[in-house]
Amino acid sequence: MSFEQKPKVTVILANLGTPDEATVPAVRRFLKQFLSDPRVIEIPKFIWWIILNLFVLPFRPKRVAHAYASVWSTDSPMREIVFEQTQRVQAYLERENKQFDLTVLPAMTYGNPGIDAVLEKLATNPQEHVILLPLFPQYSATSTAPLYDAFAKWIPTQRNLPGLTIIKDYYQHPMFIQALAESVLAYQEQHGKPEKLLMSFHGIPQPYADKGDPYADRCRITAKLVAEALHLKDDEWAISFQSRFGKQEWVKPYTDQLLQDWAKQGVKSVQVLSPAFSADCLETLEELAIQNAELFQQAGGGSYAYIPALNSDQAHIDLLAGLVQANLDALTHTLAHR
């Protein structure tokens, strides 16, 4: 299929974000932007402003900056990985779609390159179509929805709007499940099989789930499908949720408590996979890989290992590009018949 002039299509791969540097000022700026989003913290604005500015931002950035410094190389691990994913998805899609003038851009909800800045670039270079792929396998109002909000804010400011596709999530896509299962098998081929495989997901407050956020249920489906793909028995794996913040109840079971319980029950070897993350970041590299290893071993456990996120594995690139390609195929058909 060919067109008189190649239609311009932009694909945006968007992740949560990261500070610009592993320094206290940079981390404070990032946390302020992130924790000021009412999608993330559902507390009355005035009350949360007091808590954030008087009790969180004066103290938390120092500890978080120290944690970032422990995993930082030339840049944030997440940003480096998202940039590599973007380049490889671009190469894949360019090979398969000569009919489009195609660009793939990275974006972050918080920090740089910010989604708002990416959308402003599109305003000066009108597109036929924009495809947004949030790099969150399981939709949540706390992670994916802020990207919808960014588009909702941008759309009223534009005159010549593009067509828009948002890929909501892919928590049970067969290619996603297979890629996760293969990553576990590849790791275990080198390091052996543990007594327990723990699939740990970032948590959300229980009240958010009670109000209709489908995230926790989608995490459970992902975990169950991965366990089935690996032919695991019920006592060989578990699901848990990490990174709770504040005093309210979050979705359970909690990763740290489950690991301590396993250690006390005599479990000697654990491997941890986090299918909520498309790119390794502070939470996986520092909290899951280091903090939780110490927690498990101090409670009497033995071997503990974190299995890396899919990152830029070829199976992951094939998945991400395939999700976009399905929409490009539909767009090709639509443009050819209008």
UniProtKB/Swiss-Prot annotation:
One of its GO terms (molecular function) is metal ion binding. Its EC number is 4.98.1.1. Pathway: Porphyrin-containing compound metabolism; protoheme biosynthesis; protoheme from protoporphyrin-IX: step 1/1. Its main location: cytoplasm. Keywords: Cytoplasm, Heme biosynthesis, Iron, Lyase, Metal-binding, Porphyrin biosynthesis. One of its GO terms (biological process) is heme biosynthetic process. Gene3D superfamilies: 3.40.50.1400. It catalyses: heme b + 2 H(+) = protoporphyrin IX + Fe(2+). It comes from the Bacteria. Fe cation binds at residues 202, 283. It is found in: Cytoplasm. Pfam families: Ferrochelatase (PF00762). One of its GO terms (cellular component) is cytoplasm. Belongs to the ferrochelatase family. Catalyzes the ferrous insertion into protoporphyrin IX. NCBIfam families: hemH. This is Ferrochelatase. The lineage of its organism: Bacteria, Pseudomonadati, Pseudomonadota, Gammaproteobacteria, Moraxellales. The gene is hemH.
